[in-house]
A protein has these predicted regions:
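Short active-site-adjacent helix-start/loop capping segments
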Residues: 1, 23-28
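Metal-cofactor-binding active-site regions of metalloenzymes
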Residues: 1, 15-20, 194, 198
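Histidine-acidic metal/acid-base catalytic patches
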Residues: 53, 89-93, 97-102, 117-278
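Active-site-proximal loop/turn and secondary-structure-junction residues that shape catalytic pockets
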Residues: 19-24, 67-71, 107-111, 143-147, ...
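Basic, amphipathic N-terminal segments that precede the first structured/catalytic domain
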Residues: 1-10
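Active-site acidic/histidine proton-transfer and metal-coordination neighborhood
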Residues: 9-11, 15-17, 26-138, 266-268
């Protein structure tokens, strides 16, 4: 069903990546790649190989690994050292399965697992460096996942960008350290959203074919008639923030940095976002 739809859409639609979706099966209740049971690890790899085959059919070389259950529900149940090595080994096997595939790690600090073993983009970059082919292992930053880790999404994105490893991004928002809410982009922290867009624009993100995704969910009160509003709103906010970035006064920014007038720079940014003159 998917491939004919892509062909019919032509250049308007493409498959960015395929994901093994390991968090939904009883085999992976206690992890897939990091499971204490060899049969579960074999199942996780089987789904990963199958995802690579599907990706090839759909014309993409990218596999995104959201490590949803790769960690511990009981801290004493697993060795973080052995578990990390299991993940590296699993990625190496995927790299060996297809010499062209790219593996993209999407980190998250918790939920549905209690304690993730690869919780931030820094962890993902370290895993990448430890594989047999680091050039084919990158990262995906989701805004809400960074916030759940108590980190700034733009800093997480910038860290991966500096290493040439930010191969996709998922924009959304999050109200503090709760469950993963996947709120519409910018609804909780507009300034934080602005800085994510600013970072991507400044670094010409997308020039090499990278995608910017909107990983957002509708509110539970949303009617079927309004079922796409969360997507429409998120896209509208992202585009509006692009316009704000285009108006950002970098000369004034530099002046404030040179004099360490961060109060002035902060207020300038707020005025820009609120549309206040002066």
């Amino acid at each position: 069903r998917v491939l004919p739809a892509l062909i019919a859409a032509g250049e308007k639609l493409a498959a960015e990546f395929v994901a093994p979706r390991l968090w939904m099966d009883p085999h992976t209740a206690d992890g897939g790649y990091m499971s204490s049971w060899a049969s579960d690890r074999e199942y996780a790899l089987w789904r990963s190989y199958r995802s690579i085959d599907i990706a090839n059919e759909l014309g993409t070389d990218m596999i995104v690994l959201w490590l949803a259950r790769e960690g511990t529900l009981c801290a004493e149940s697993k060795s973080p050292v052995a578990s990390t090595r299991l993940l590296i080994d699993a990625i190496n096997q995927m790299l060996a399965y297809d010499p062209k595939v790219r593996i993209v790690i999407e980190p998250k600090p918790n939920e549905p697992i209690d304690r993730s073993i690869c919780g931030t983009i820094g962890h993902a970059m370290a895993i990448s460096a430890a594989t047999n082919d680091p050039a084919r292992v990158g990262g995906n930053v989701e805004s809400a996942h960074a916030i759940l880790a108590g980190l700034d999404p733009s800093h997480e994105m910038g860290f991966a960008l500096a290493l040439g490893k930010l191969w996709t991004v998922h924009l959304n928002d999050q109200n503090g350290i709760r469950f993963d809410q996947d709120k519409s982009f910018g609804v909780e922290n507009l300034r934080q959203a602005f800085n994510q867009v600013k970072l991507l624009v400044e670094n010409n993100y997308g020039a090499h074919g990278e995608y910017v995704g909107l990983d957002v969910k509708a509110m539970r009160t949303t009617t079927d008639a309004d079922g796409y509003k969360h997507l429409e709103n998120s896209l509208a906010v992202a585009r509006a923030l692009e316009d704000k970035v285009a108006k950002f006064d970098y000369a004034y920014q530099q002046k404030c940095v040179e004099t360490r007038d961060y109060e002035g720079l902060e207020m300038y940014t707020l005025r820009l976002l609120m549309g206040i003159e002066g």
